[in-house]
């Protein structure tokens, strides 16, 4: 099923309501059938959740309004919806994964597999959001979740991809999904980097950032304890665990999939210097722990739900969204703008082969 495309305008509360209405049917079913939902809801009345709520209300009232609207549109209790949006802060085993390829050059290139709970397959969307306070942006969204913690780009030419980090011993702070929601709303790369270094998140993420007319891609790993930034000068990959030298001592879980994907990314980049990023993202050579993940019995309960490829040019971003191991995009974008709104995925797409 092709990803939906949503166009949302209005106040932050209005946007939240519309996102909730879009995801309501899927999330109601998910709440009844998902062990992950039940596990996260066990934290609903925890003091850590209450503190995180206070932090959002104090530091980001606009995003608190989005969460309130999201709960209204979902027709679910706000406490449940907020707790779900703190899932990765509260529980290291939340079903979020992802893989990113970073290739500095002319232009800089960035590609990403969005790995999430297969129960959400067919229920996600690309959404363009324009509020009164943020630059317009387009991002991949899950039912019941704030935008900004997946992949996307804004009107200022800032793009970002986000990978799960299974950090341990999270502490009170801003939910990591609120941190990345703020980052995709930043007017430029410098402001996004200043912001992520200044806040105190509860949990952790890896974020790769680039901006049109900026020389570098920047890799960011943050946890409650620390934030590390690296300007990338050579091709590299990230498979959702902390790999920065400054962060490797931090307590985390590295699953078999995460570890083997990291090894495979490095193998592909070393063996084929000119390899296309999507060729790596569509790789399945390691059968038990493939880079492209489509097994309903995936050991981390994650499947690749979409892929994105960004070219960070001198004056704009050009990027595409893909589904399946298909090189033919389903959507094309320039910065935050959809370029071909009637695009249909071809049935005769060029499928991936292992390098």
Regions found by a protein language model. Name each.
Residues 1-96, 186-217, 224-225, 234-355:
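C-terminus-biased signal that marks the final domain/tail of proteins
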Residues 128-132, 158-161, 179-182, 226-229, ...:
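Short, low-complexity, polar/charged sequence segments that are solvent-exposed and flexible
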Residues 116-118, 166-168, 225-227, 324-327:
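Short, surface-exposed beta-strand-loop junctions and turns on beta-sheet-rich folds
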Residues 111-115, 220, 320:
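Catalytic Cys-His active-site segments of thiol-dependent hydrolases/isopeptidases
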Residues 221, 230:
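Extended polysaccharide-engagement surfaces of secreted carbohydrate-active enzymes
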Residues 53, 168-170, 176-184:
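Flexible, glycine/proline-enriched loop segments at strand-loop-helix junctions
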Residues 5-7, 26, 37-41, 58-176, ...:
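A contiguous strand-loop segment
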Residues 107, 176-180, 189, 193:
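Hydrophobic, well-ordered secondary-structure segments
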């Amino acid at each position: 099923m092709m990803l939906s495309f949503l166009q949302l305008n209005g106040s932050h509360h209005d946007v939240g309501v519309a996102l909730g209405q879009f995801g309501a049917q899927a999330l109601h079913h998910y709440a009844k059938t998902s062990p992950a939902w039940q596990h996260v809801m066990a934290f609903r009345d925890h003091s850590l959740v209450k503190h995180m709520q206070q932090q959002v209300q104090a530091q980001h009232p606009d995003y608190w309004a989005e969460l309130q609207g999201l709960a209204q549109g979902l027709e679910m209790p706000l406490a449940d919806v907020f707790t779900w949006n703190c899932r990765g802060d509260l529980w290291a085993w939340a079903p979020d994964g992802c893989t990113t390829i970073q290739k500095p050059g002319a232009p800089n290139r960035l590609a990403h597999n969005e790995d999430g709970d297969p129960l959400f397959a067919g229920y996600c969307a690309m959404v363009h959001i324009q509020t009164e306070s943020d630059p317009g942006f387009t991002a991949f969204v899950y039912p019941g979740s704030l935008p900004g913690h997946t992949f996307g780009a804004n009107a200022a030419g800032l793009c970002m991809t986000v990978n799960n980090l299974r950090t341990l011993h999270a502490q009170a702070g801003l939910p990591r999904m609120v941190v990345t929601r703020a980052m995709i709303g930043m007017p430029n790369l410098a402001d996004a980097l200043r912001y992520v270094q200044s806040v105190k998140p509860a949990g952790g993420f890896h974020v790769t950032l680039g901006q049109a007319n900026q020389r570098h891609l920047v890799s960011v790993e943050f946890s409650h304890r620390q934030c590390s930034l690296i300007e990338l000068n050579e091709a590299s990959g990230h498979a959702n665990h902390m790999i920065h030298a400054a962060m490797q001592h931090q307590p985390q879980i590295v699953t078999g999939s995460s570890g083997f994907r990291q090894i495979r990314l490095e193998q592909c980049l070393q063996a084929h210097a000119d390899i296309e990023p999507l060729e790596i993202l569509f790789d399945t050579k390691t059968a038990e722990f493939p880079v492209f993940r489509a097994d309903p019995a995936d050991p981390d309960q994650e499947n690749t739900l979409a892929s994105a490829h960004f070219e960070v040019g001198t004056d704009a971003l050009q990027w595409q969204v893909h589904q399946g191991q298909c090189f033919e995009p389903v959507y094309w974008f320039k910065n935050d703008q959809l370029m071909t709104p009637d695009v249909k995925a071809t049935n005769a797409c060029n499928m991936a082969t292992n390098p």
